[in-house]
Amino acid sequence: MLILSRKVNEGIVIDDNIHIKVISIDRGSVRLGFEAPESTLILRAELKEAIVSENQKASVCVDESLLENIKKVIKP
């Protein structure tokens, strides 16, 4: 992990097309501004974690024996 110190109005550039700028620092909260191509997905970490969690809940693990029983019922 790269750790950088930045002051208000300072920023960093990632891969020539993603610009991150420190907008403000107030009471332990940092506001960041992002400029990136529209095709770049930018999410807060907690939102990304929630999406991953919901996707895991939505995925279904099917028992192999159940599939075999279905194959017996549906004969070509």
Swiss-Prot record:
Pfam family, one: CsrA
Functional note: A translational regulator that binds mRNA to regulate translation initiation and/or mRNA stability. Usually binds in the 5'-UTR at or near the Shine-Dalgarno sequence preventing ribosome-binding, thus repressing translation. Its main target seems to be the major flagellin gene, while its function is anatagonized by FliW.
Subunit-structure text: Homodimer; the beta-strands of each monomer intercalate to form a hydrophobic core, while the alpha-helices form wings that extend away from the core.
Annotated GO biological process: bacterial-type flagellum organization; mRNA catabolic process; negative regulation of translational initiation; regulation of bacterial-type flagellum assembly; regulation of carbohydrate metabolic process
Primary gene name: csrA
Keywords tagged on the record: Bacterial flagellum biogenesis, Cytoplasm, Repressor, RNA-binding, Translation regulation
Organism for this UniProt entry: Helicobacter pylori (strain ATCC 700392 / 26695) (Campylobacter pylori)
HAMAP family, alphabetized: CsrA
GO molecular function: mRNA 5'-UTR binding
Protein name: Translational regulator CsrA
Subcellular location: Cytoplasm
Signal peptide from the UniProt entry: none
Coiled-coil stretches noted in the UniProt entry, renumbered to this chain: none
An example Gene Ontology CC term for this record: cytosol
Similarity annotation: Belongs to the CsrA/RsmA family.
